[in-house]
Amino acid sequence: DHQESADYSKYLEKHFGSPDEFTNEQTVWHNIDGFKRVVCRDEYILHGSPAPHYDFVYCYVDLEVPEDMSDELAKCSGSILIDHLKNEVGARCGSLTANATTLNFVMDVVAGRTEAVKDEYEKRILGMKAMFDNGEKYELDWWPDESGDADPGNEYYKEGYITLEGTRCWKGY
């Protein structure tokens, strides 16, 4: 139903091969690009923070988040998904790069390197986007970016911005 998520799924398949799981609703890869699991869902969720964009790809890592941090992390972004039973954290964004940025923020909060504050989270997402817009590749120590998702020369992102339903959105948050 949602062409954008279908296109991104094809982009992932080009770089990582056929998905490990495939249904009419989603494609799933296990243990790729530094993530425990990557799920591309047939959805297109408008998310207004820190600027309008659409979410449809989920990335997960193993990370034990203390329960007393959950509420504060949830206030930072609706894109942060915590599963205390699995000791797993997910991010739902519009690209692997945005998900890696989101997960890195959670890792930094859990490790005590930063506070769980919405302004800090948004600063990181906007910083990632600014680097991309300036032709700089975004990098994280733990994330290998095997698909070149964070490369500003990536053909998938050549359009940069899209307009849907009257809303100008950045493609790839």
Where are these regions (language model features)?
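Non-cytosolic coordination micro-motifs
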Residues: 1-26, 31-37, 43-173
